[in-house]
Amino acid sequence: MVVAKPTAAVSIEDLIKKHSDVDPFLVKKWERIFSLFFDRNASHQVDWGDFYLVVKKVRDIYGAESVQTGFAKKSLAALWEGLCSIADADKDQLISIDEWIGLLKKTDAKTEPKWFKDYQNFMFKLFDVSCDGVMDLAEYTDGMSTYGFDQSECDAAFHKFSVDKKGQYVPQMKPETWNTYFHQLFYSTNKSDVGNHLFGIIDF
């Protein structure tokens, strides 16, 4: 296993300049996703160790023998292999922030790739502890705690995005709605789309 070595932090301003062909709002969102959900050891590169830290946290929260832990082990291993096969340009078993942005900007948002759909489905199933096909605030909060979010942050975010077309709060979210918001989070340049706040309220 290759272990990521700490590298100099890349500022968001530098990333925006380097990837000037991408909307700055998307670059900011992509960097946030990379830092919060993939680069768990803050090395500015993603390796299998980052994914293992997520599995370990899932185990701590849900239990070693839980459905969530077994699902996380299986799904994250497959996701890592999939990401490496298409994003790891220099084949060093490390995915840098530039490789991550490069992967996303060459992805056709209209035809989501397998790794994207796998990640989208993994996150919903991880959160849906009761396996009833819908997600509520308590499940969302437990899932987000895997990534270090506290209850107040989760409550604010869930009430922000779990709404109907009239803006009224909806206490449970279906997979179809989750998928729409997940797509908005990754690819929408419209700052008013509620999917931008799917993994915590953003203020940029």
From Swiss-Prot:
The keyword Transmembrane helix does not apply. Residues 25-61, 75-110, 115-150 form the EF-hand domain. Ca(2+) 1 binds at D39, N41, S43, Q45, D50. The keyword Transcription does not apply. PROSITE patterns: EF_HAND_1, EF_HAND_2. Keywords: Calcium, Metal-binding, Repeat. Ca(2+) 2 binds at D88, D90, D92, E99. InterPro entries: EF-hand-dom_pair (IPR011992), EF_Hand_1_Ca_BS (IPR018247), EF_hand_dom (IPR002048). It comes from the Eukaryota. One of its GO terms (molecular function) is calcium ion binding. Ca(2+) 3 binds at D128, S130, D132, E139. This is Calexcitin-1. It comes from Caenorhabditis elegans. The lineage of its organism: Eukaryota, Metazoa, Ecdysozoa, Nematoda, Chromadorea. The gene is cex-1.
